[in-house]
Amino acid sequence: MAALPAQLAISTPAHAVETFHTCTGFIDSIPTTISTQGTWCLRNNVSTSITSGAAITIATNNVTIDCNDFKIGGLGAGVNTNTSGIYASYKLNATIRNCSIRGFRTGINLGSADAAVVQDNRLDQNTYRGISVSGNGTLIQRNQVNDTGAGPAAITEVSAIYTSGSTTVEDNIVQNVIASNGTNVSVYGFQITSGVGSSVSRNIARNLVANGTGGSYGIYTSNGLKAFITGNRVAVTNANGIGIRCNASNGSAKDNITWGFSTGIDSGCYNDGGNTSH
């Protein structure tokens, strides 16, 4: 089986050894499904060329995936991939940490996943979304999301980090969200939808490149209430778009810096001071 119980004798890089004694079991090949609660760990790089489904499916509540800085790879499926790197739906308390995930349609895809935590991951070369999390009480922090885009022509938008529901998004770095294919594709560094009282703070987004009449958006909130957008830095080179966008005067913007957008911070945001647009 791909997911194996923890064993005493293992061969691993030194940097990962400290965490292995806490592992419920190991993920040694993919695709695989996790059906037992606990902490499931990688101890080597794994990859797959499947074009649909998921490399790792979380099928129960209270699961942690700890990759120990190893890679989950999906580049073999090509740019038309329909695969998620890690997937869960209607599962509580999922945690994804210390993973390097590349080459999927969506790197981390958690739907209706209340209390999910996504932290300390590196995602790159995913074609549609790097991280996508819906659910309330979620936390997305200290992730690096690079080189999102290059999907099939049918894609109409690309997001590095997408959320739906009340969430906290903090201390993430997003770089190179680029609409390489398609027509009039909009790109988003942080796309925050729905939820009440979401917090988006101390994030960085740079080099967001739409195509055609599509727009570039550093932080884009919609259909939500009372979002707090604080201390973020977003930058592009002369983009048609908005650095920070709030929905229907339902967001507070404070101490943010935007650079290179046609509109730095739109009028839907309450300007609570310290914001600068260049």
Give residue spans per PLM region.
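Extracellular beta-strand/beta-solenoid scaffold signature
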Residues: 51-56, 78-87, 103-110, 125-132, ...
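Parallel beta-helix/beta-solenoid
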Residues: 37, 59-62, 67, 81, ...
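Low-complexity, intrinsically disordered tandem-repeat tracts enriched in small residues
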Residues: 9, 116, 138, 145, ...
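Right-handed parallel beta-helix/beta-spiral solenoid domain characteristic of secreted/periplasmic
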Residues: 20-28, 39-52, 63-106, 278
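Sec-dependent, cleavable N-terminal signal peptides
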Residues: 1-16
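Functionally critical loop-and-helix segments that line ligand-binding/catalytic clefts
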Residues: 20-24, 71, 228, 250-278
